[in-house]
Amino acid sequence: RMDEHYPTKLPNGAQPYKVILNEVAIRNDGSLFKDHAVHAVLKKHFKDVKHEGGEWFACTLADVQAAILEVKTGVRNEDKRTLSFGLRPEQTAAIDKAVQYFDSYKSENTDKTPHFLWNAKMRFGKTFAAYQLAKKMGWKKVLILTFKPAVQNAWEEDLANHLDFAGWQFMSRKTDFDVADLDKSKPLVCFGSFQDFLGKNKAGGIKANNEWVHATNWDCVIFDEYHYGAWRESAKELFEAEDKNELEFAEGEGMAYFDEANMPITTGHYLYLSGTPFRAISSGEFIEEQIFNWTYSDEQRAKEVWQDEVNPYAALPRMVMLTYQLPPAIRDVALKGEFNEFDLNEFFKADGVDVNATFKYENEVQKWLDLIRGAMLE
């Protein structure tokens, strides 16, 4: 089709156009559609897209993707959402197990709040699955407390771009909002750091701008990156932020440590998300029926046995994880308490860039390499 518009090639033989989007013209119900259907959506539903005449429109790639999505799904997409992917089997299983536990616990313990943990590695898609759980449970008010504020983008983007969450409201400290402007008829997702929302002001009270969070009875409180909070260290040490901006966003005055039992926020459900909740599990904080597990091995096993044409795991590469057993002599030094602290980022810190980069502790790094090569065995 483009060759009809641009039949003449450039002097170097290249095409005078570039294809930046290639989509299959099949609706979700299996029927086919033509470009005219996309043109109609661009003209009728996207008011900021200018029709230049014929098949030409002044628009962005995202505009076209959103229009195609509306044609495929048959769902109005005035918010210009560009994602419509579904749940993978393990995400559905995680949701089903959580729903079953929540319902069962509530029927037997009307005066208590159920807790559930998703112990799932990276690439599981915890944010998307958590939102789908909220939809299935019919939750309208969801509070996300994170122990690592850098994850906000993932929570915000899934809600803003996926067609399943059209009409949902997202707010955080970084978004410009007024609580009075909230539409109570639409689902609300509020995101913040646990230090900010649970921290106290200098007088020992709730921060003024967070009073509404404490006054709201949330349908669910989600603890993201829960393993950071499970260490029960001081708030500033717990957060080891990647940069000063993140630390500033995360900090809250007077929050000595996280203790959910004394949390001054009410909710009907708790959902915990973590890829490494080892301490929480080993301490007995969760029993087997309160946990859904998904490992890299589970992921790769699902990838190998997938039979359908489109494998949702195909883009997930195999990961090889190795562990190293420290020699007894080194363990003895650590257990005596003389040198019992270690910062991985500081140890491998480098100065310079590209070929001029060098380790700050080059001698120590070399000794570490010698160690894992068996130097202690000599």
Predicted feature residues:
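SF2 helicase catalytic motif II
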Residues: Q195-D196, E211-L271, T276
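Interdomain helical connector at the RecA1-RecA2 junction of SF1/SF2 helicase-like NTPases
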Residues: H269, A280-L377
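Short basic/glycine-enriched coil/helix segment immediately N-terminal to the Walker B
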Residues: T110-D111, D183-K186, A203-D219
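Non-catalytic accessory segments flanking enzymatic or RNA/DNA-binding domains
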Residues: M2-P89
